[in-house]
Structure formats: structure tokens, C-alpha cells
Regions:
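Solvent-exposed soluble domains appended to multi-pass membrane proteins
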Residues: 1-200
Length: 200
């Protein structure tokens, strides 16, 4: 939410503050307390739509953890920031998500997915046919189950830096995805669009 996006030094007088036990981390306290309020608001939203007749789907997710005290993450991960590798960095981008509906949909737990694939999951839950662009994303997800700004996950759940021992299949999928994504969001660039239409 906008409320939870920062900064985290507002000294808000929370009615029921949430903070890491045994520590004095004001930024962490601010974020966790605001998250609790957002969680309560989400519960209110769901309870409202539970009573509505119109079919409704709600999706809530985060894209990364907040920029709060480094000490908080060092304690959480058990390592100094200087010793973090790709696996530890990725954990700062691992956030929960939920897709809820006021009618029966397919349920799943412990799903690992990246934000770029979440739209497809939502469309399929809603029974909407995937547009061509999303169909390609679906194809990519079959070989690359998750990706973000730092790297990608292979089918065994291991994270890699881009360009790090990529197979020909993965390299080709990522290259074509980059072209398609650029065209999808920047179709006014005619030169790049020509490259897009040359893609097979």
C-alpha cells in the first residue's frame, strides 16, 4: 500500500504497535505496525465481498521487502550484509501473495511465482483467455518458474544471475521475452517494434 511504502521514521503513535522482540528498530516497528493495519483493512475488504452476489476476485501481493534497518535483515538472515550472496538477496524479494474470490476457485499453497507471472494466474482463475502476450509469458514460466531484477530461478529452485550458465533454451526465452516486453510497454519505438515483428 502507499501507507507501507515508506519512509519509516514518522514516529506514529500506534494503538497496537508491532516490533521485533528485544530490539529497538524504529523503522521496522513503523513498517510492521503499518502492515498490521493493512492486514486488518484487507480482512474488512474480504468480509464485505463475502456478502456480495457479484463474482469478485481480489489479489494482493508485494514486490519487495522495505528499506528499513540493515540490522533487521542481518538478524533475520543470520549473516552480515557484506556476506550475502544471490540466495540471501533474493529473500528480500520473496513476499507473500493471495488470490481470494467470493466463489469457488482452485486452491493452492506454497506456490513460488514471480510478479510477472501473477497476472496470468489471476486471469486463469477468472476464466479469462490469455492474450497473446500472456501466452508467451506462460511459455516462459514452464522453463523459468520465477525471475526478477536480480536473476532467475531454474526448475530445481536454484537462483542464477542473468548470463550465468544459461542454457540455449533459457537464453532464447529471456531474449525474446525482453523484446516482447519492450514492445508491449513501448510500442511507440518503431525501430524496436521492427525487431519485435521479426521474432519467431
Amino acid at each position: 500500500t502507499i501507507q507501507n511504502h515508506g519512509g519509516y521514521l514518522t514516529n506514529t503513535n500506534w494503538k497496537d504497535p508491532v516490533y521485533p522482540e528485544g530490539s529497538h528498530l524504529p523503522e521496522a516497528k513503523e513498517f510492521l505496525s503499518a502492515t498490521k493495519v493493512s492486514d486488518d483493512a484487507f480482512q474488512y475488504l474480504v468480509k464485505y465481498f463475502e456478502k456480495q452476489d457479484e463474482p469478485t476476485i481480489i489479489c494482493m501481493f508485494g514486490d519487495h521487502h522495505p528499506s528499513i534497518e540493515t540490522e533487521f535483515y542481518e538478524t533475520l538472515l543470520g549473516k552480515k550484509q557484506s556476506d550475502w550472496g544471490l540466495e540471501e538477496i533474493q529473500k528480500r524479494y520473496a513476499t507473500p501473495f493471495i488470490i481470494w474470490a467470493n466463489y469457488d476457485i482452485e486452491e493452492a499453497k506454497e506456490v513460488s511465482i514471480s510478479n510477472n507471472y501473477l497476472e496470468n494466474m489471476l486471469l486463469k482463475q477468472a476464466g479469462i483467455t490469455l492474450p497473446l502476450y500472456n501466452q508467451y509469458i506462460e511459455k516462459v514460466s514452464q522453463d523459468i518458474p520465477a525471475m526478477n531484477v536480480n536473476g532467475y530461478m531454474d526448475m530445481n529452485g536454484k537462483w542464477h544471475n542473468y548470463g550465468d550458465s544459461e542454457s540455449k533454451t533459457v537464453s532464447s526465452l529471456l531474449h525474446n521475452y525482453e523484446i516482447l516486453q519492450y514492445g508491449y510497454y513501448s510500442d511507440s519505438d518503431k525501430t524496436t517494434m521492427k525487431k519485435l515483428f521479426q521474432w519467431k
